[in-house]
UniProtKB/Swiss-Prot annotation:
This protein's encoding gene: recF
Function comment: The RecF protein is involved in DNA metabolism; it is required for DNA replication and normal SOS inducibility. RecF binds preferentially to single-stranded, linear DNA. It also seems to bind ATP.
Pfam families: SMC_N
Positions of ATP binding: G30, E31, N32, A33, Q34, G35, K36, T37
Protein name: DNA replication and repair protein RecF
Family: Belongs to the RecF family.
UniProt subcellular location: Cytoplasm
One GO MF term: single-stranded DNA binding
PANTHER family reported in the protein's UniProt record: DNA REPLICATION AND REPAIR PROTEIN RECF
The entry's keywords: ATP-binding, Cytoplasm, DNA damage, DNA repair, DNA replication, DNA-binding, Nucleotide-binding, SOS response
Predominant localisation class: cytoplasm
Length: 387
């Protein structure tokens, strides 16, 4: 897939800006707080319907405006599509595909897929379980759009159950029973999908980590569900029964802490290098190699599942990589993946990145083309991405 254009109206600090993407790699150059990351955030919204920065739509609407309108033109193997998201200061968002209003915004998922890599992604290694769950969930939403619906349902049941647990002194335990069953049913659906995604991702990530580390390091990614699958299987009914039993066993603790302690909202991933937990022992260089390996694995997995390459969004991260890791990334993506890159300066880049990129300067929500060393037609670009 190839993102041909993006039109932002009253989105963040963009009043009315159109950008045409004319090369497989686009570098967004500018000082901090000028709008580079905001542009990547717009692409992220089309990919996942979420922002990793804020949870409320009104925080994305430009100050003084009632709504923001984002329009993307995307080339897919099946043809060109126009996607639109309208965000409101008040009220629900509105999404369209090719002029048709979608009754469920989740139906837009899968139209434009992307993998984002920023300096914040180092939290995958050194941060808490929530960061690792969020990363896995963003991947799954693009691989299986139904996953977003499961998450919504699970979140609703979890909130209802926690609201009851907060009334521990006067709680009628019979009210928990139907919510326990729903939590187990939906929770197992989520854990099964997470488990299967990790099984497919592990060999890809391990391969890239060996390559980047010069065959010196072995990466192991292990899924740690809140409730272990019975007998090393993911058979749904048996897994649900085990989760219900664990909920019953933790009842006193849940009443004491007034929150749900069992379910996929307590899952984690264990990342280890050569048998040692990366969170505790990995150097900064090893952490960067690990996260880069995960991101390259994401790209490959999405391409394998969808049959088309996703976009790669690099948010001020290349400066965090030494030239060797930059070269590994450059060789891995070549022209297969359309790449949008933000940076404050070009000096830390491998020169081959600069020579083959479209360069746009970003200043206070305005974009200006600096150089387009290669200016092939859209058709030839799409052909190069598919070759």
């Amino acid at each position: 897939m190839f993102l041909h254009s993006l039109h932002l109206q009253h989105f963040r600090n963009y009043r009315d800006q159109t950008v045409q993407f004319q090369a497989p790699k686009t570098i967004l150059l500018g000082e901090n707080a000028q709008g580079k990351t905001n542009l990547l955030e717009a692409v992220e919204l089309f990919s996942t319907l979420r922002s990793h920065r804020v949870s409320r739509d009104r925080d994305l609407v430009q100050t003084g405006a009632e709504s923001a309108l984002l329009t993307a033109v995307v080339e897919r193997d099946s043809g060109e599509q126009q996607l639109q998201i309208q965000l409101q200061q008040q009220g629900r968002r509105r999404v369209q595909r090719d002029g048709e209003v979608l009754r469920r915004q989740l139906d837009l998922l899968g139209s434009l897929c992307s993998v984002q890599f920023s300096s914040l992604d180092l939290d995958l290694v050194r941060g808490g379980p929530q960061q690792r769950r969020d990363w896995l969930d963003r991947l799954l939403i693009q691989l299986q759009p139904i996953y977003a619906h499961l998450q919504q349902q699970y979140g609703r049941v979890l909130r209802q159950r926690n609201a009851l647990l907060r009334r521990a002194e006067s709680l009628d335990l019979a009210l928990l029973a139907p919510l326990n069953w729903q939590l187990a049913q939906l929770g197992v659906h989520i854990m099964r999908r997470r488990s299967r995604a990790i099984q497919r991702l592990v060999p890809l990530a391990a391969h890239w980590h060996r390559e980047i580390s010069g065959q010196r390091e072995q990466l192991i990614v292990a899924y740690q569900p809140s409730v272990l699958a019975p007998d090393d299987t993911d058979e749904a009914i048996a897994w649900q029964e085990r989760m219900l039993a664990q909920i019953e066993a933790r009842r006193a603790a849940e009443l004491g802490q007034r929150t749900s302690l069992v379910g996929p909202h307590r899952d984690d991933l264990n990342l280890s290098i050569n048998g040692t937990e990366a969170r505790l022992q990995a150097s900064q260089g090893q952490q960067r190699t690990l996260v880069l390996s995960l991101k390259l694995a994401e790209l490959e997995l999405i391409e394998a599942v969808l049959g088309e390459p996703p976009l790669l969004l690099l948010d001020d991260v290349l400066a965090e990589l030494d030239l060797r890791r930059q070269q590994q990334l450059l060789e891995a993506i070549a022209n297969r993946f359309q790449t949008l890159i933000t940076t404050t300066h070009l000096s830390a880049f491998d020169q081959s990145w600069v020579e083959t990129a479209q360069i746009l300067t970003v200043q206070s929500g305005h974009l200006q083309s600096e150089a387009v060393p290669m200016a092939p037609s859209s058709a030839s670009l799409h052909k190069s991405l598919d070759s």
